[in-house]
């Protein structure tokens, strides 16, 4: 077996082993894997603020009310400040939470983000290379919302129902404040439970609490390119430990 092929096999083994080890570590306490109230509020406010930002520039004017016999005219209300805009933004708001994935390689609330997780991308890459990966479910179901994300969605619905009047108050009277601050810090969470609101994704991978340097990132990219070039030559199918999809 040549050194390049041996290196590829070693990389594949370490990739699966790293993902598996991280999952086993979190399986010790299932409650730690459930989203916190802070995380639910953060995602709820993020999604609503984003939807309102998307529709905020509309110049549409709504005609409200009916023309009465008295001759009273309909009211003209800009869509950008109308109740209709808020109602449309709230419609299916929590359904959009199902677009999120669990990124087990990230910490805290950054664990929840849209798009495919790094771990899942790695595992799919292994499958494409012919490596057998067992998540306990068919391959075609890998991209379905996980139990954790489904729980997020249900908690979003519960929170929205409970604080819908507060959201309305913010929309009509307090939009000078970020919704996250007004809703989560001001009404939903105790002061001691707001830490997740300060967590921000920088787009850089975090290892042991420190960001990787540019040199380290470039070195890893070069190594990955070399491994991918050699990976095209692989045809063998390996056997690896069964993984838990909930932490991908």
Swiss-Prot record:
Q: Name one GO biological process term.
A: positive regulation of protein localization to plasma membrane
| Signal peptide location | 1-21
* Disulfide bond entries: 38-196, 41-184, 94-156
Q: Which GO terms describe its molecular function?
A: signaling receptor binding
Instruction: State which residue ranges cross the membrane.
Output: none
Quick one: where's region Disordered?
200-248
Q: Name one Pfam family in it.
A: DUF3456
Bias (Acidic residues) occurs at: 213-230
Task: Write out the annotated subcellular location.
Answer: Secreted
Q: What keywords tag this UniProt record? A: Disulfide bond, Secreted, Signal
Q: Which domain of life is it from?
A: Eukaryota
Q: From start to end residue, where is composition biased (Basic and acidic residues)?
A: 231-248
Q: What is its main location?
A: secreted
- Protein biosynthesis as UniProt keyword: no
This protein's GO CC annotations: extracellular region
The keyword DNA damage belongs to this UniProt entry's keyword annotation: no
Q: Which InterPro entries match?
A: DUF3456
Query: Its function?
Result: Plays a role in the regulation of the cell surface expression of TLR4.
How is this protein organized at the quaternary level?
Answer: Interacts with TLR4.
For this chain, the family text in UniProt reads: Belongs to the canopy family.
Name-wise, this protein is Protein canopy homolog 4
Q: Which organism is it from?
A: Homo sapiens (Human)
- What gene name is listed for this protein? CNPY4
């Amino acid at each position: 077996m040549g050194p390049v092929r041996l290196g590829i096999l070693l990389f594949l083994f370490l990739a699966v082993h790293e993902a598996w080890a991280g999952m086993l570590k979190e399986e010790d306490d299932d409650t730690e894997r459930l989203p916190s109230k802070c995380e639910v509020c953060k995602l709820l406010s993020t999604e609503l603020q984003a939807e309102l930002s998307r529709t905020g520039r509309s110049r549409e004017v709504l005609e409200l009310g009916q023309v009465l016999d008295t001759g009273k005219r309909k009211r003209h209300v800009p869509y950008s400040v109308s109740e209709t805009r808020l109602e449309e933004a709230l419609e299916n708001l929590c359904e959009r939470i199902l677009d999120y994935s669990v990124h087990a390689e990230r910490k805290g609330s950054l664990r929840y983000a849209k798009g495919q997780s790094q771990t899942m991308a790695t595992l799919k890459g292994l499958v494409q290379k012919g490596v057998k990966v067992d998540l306990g479910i068919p391959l075609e179901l890998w991209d379905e919302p996980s139990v954790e994300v489904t729980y997020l969605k249900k908690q979003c619905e519960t929170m929205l129902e409970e604080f819908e009047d507060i959201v309305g108050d913010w929309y009509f009277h307090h939009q000078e404040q970020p919704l996250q601050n007004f809703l989560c810090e001001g009404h939903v969470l105790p002061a001691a439970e707001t830490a997740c609101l300060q967590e921000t994704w920088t787009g850089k991978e975090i290892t042991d609490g420190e960001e990787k340097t540019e040199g380290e990132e470039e070195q890893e990219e070069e190594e990955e390119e070399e491994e991918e070039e050699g990976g095209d030559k692989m045809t063998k199918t390996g056997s690896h430990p069964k993984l838990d999809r909930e932490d991908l």
